[in-house]
Swiss-Prot record:
Name of the encoding gene: thyX
Organism: Clostridium tetani (strain Massachusetts / E88)
Catalytic EC class: transferase
PROSITE patterns: THYX (PS51331)
Name of this chain's protein: Flavin-dependent thymidylate synthase
Highest taxon above the source species: Bacteria
Role noted for this protein: Catalyzes the reductive methylation of 2'-deoxyuridine-5'-monophosphate (dUMP) to 2'-deoxythymidine-5'-monophosphate (dTMP) while utilizing 5,10-methylenetetrahydrofolate (mTHF) as the methyl donor, and NADPH and FADH(2) as the reductant.
GO molecular function, one term: thymidylate synthase (FAD) activity
Family to which the UniProt record says this protein belongs: Belongs to the thymidylate synthase ThyX family.
GO biological process: dTMP biosynthetic process; dTTP biosynthetic process; methylation
Keyword Endoplasmic reticulum among record annotations: no
E.C. number(s) listed in UniProt: 2.1.1.148
Keywords: FAD, Flavoprotein, Methyltransferase, NADP, Nucleotide biosynthesis, Transferase
Length: 249
């Protein structure tokens, strides 16, 4: 059983080919009297960039829904994925604790806990106790089901699906998810914000870095809400809008 601090690992697995041209084509079609093929021939890289800038300035976001991005994330906690799936216009596939037996589960240690020896010791002890409880419950239930005539493989599966309830939010997990560009921009507004929790903020920043490599003009103004507008946090605002613009723009 090993703990991790801030070891989120994000990879952009797949994305719509030529995402910026696809978005520009969809947007231009709304205003063009010509056919799709003729319109596409006229879309040079320069015109694509110009059209994307115009779209963003107008707030015309529906065309950006035509492109999607698929990510894989590892080294993240269940606490993070509970927050992630609140962004509902997306598709998610997460490692199952019901079907995957965790003989030695890994866990995420929050940095504030990790840098204090006392709280770190308490935290690690709690993680170790969770593993011991899981092992004992799973073993006890498995033997019970076998004694009742159940086959071993089926008994193990049935046992771990209940034993998993003792695992904490810190339990490390892996997830693959797909979002369209409009959902991503909304995600970045909320999760790149300093008021988002540290772990999902780290994830959001890594994701933004990845999509900027393949669609730099599309995500040029992405980041927390204050980067390209007003802060919606009111009295809870961090007051760092100018600093955020320097970081993200």
């Amino acid at each position: 059983m090993r703990g991790k601090t801030m070891g989120v690992k994000v990879k952009l697995l797949e994305y719509t080919p030529n995402p910026e041209k696809v978005v520009a084509s969809a947007a231009k079609l709304c205003y063009s009297p010509v056919g799709v093929e003729e319109m596409a021939k006229d879309l040079s890289e320069e015109k694509v960039n110009k059209f994307l800038n115009m779209l963003m300035s107008y707030g015309h976001e529906s065309p950006i829904e035509h492109v999607s991005f698929t990510f894989a994330a590892e080294g993240v906690s269940r606490s993070l994925t509970h927050q992630l799936v609140r962004h509902r216009i997306a598709s998610y596939s997460q490692q199952s604790q019901r079907y995957v037996k965790l003989d030695q589960f890994q866990y995420i240690i929050p940095p504030e806990i990790d840098k204090d020896n006392n709280t770190r010791s308490i935290f690690i002890e709690a993680m170790e106790n969770s593993q011991k409880a899981y092992d004992k419950i799973a073993s006890t239930l498995e033997q019970k089901y076998i004694s009742e005539g159940m086959k071993r493989k089926e008994a193990e599966k049935k046992a771990i699906e209940d034993a998993r309830y003792v695992f904490p939010n810190a339990c490390e997990t892996k997830i693959i998810f797909t979002m369209n560009a409009r959902t991503l921009m909304n995600f970045f507004r909320h999760r790149c914000c300093t008021r988002a929790q540290w772990e999902i903020r780290n994830l959001a920043n890594e994701m933004l870095s990845e999509v900027k490599k393949v669609a730099p003009n599309l995500f040029k103004y992405s980041g927390p809400s204050c980067v390209n507008g007003n802060c919606p946090e009111g009295a809870m605002s961090c007051g760092k809008a100018a600093e955020m613009k320097k970081i993200y723009l």
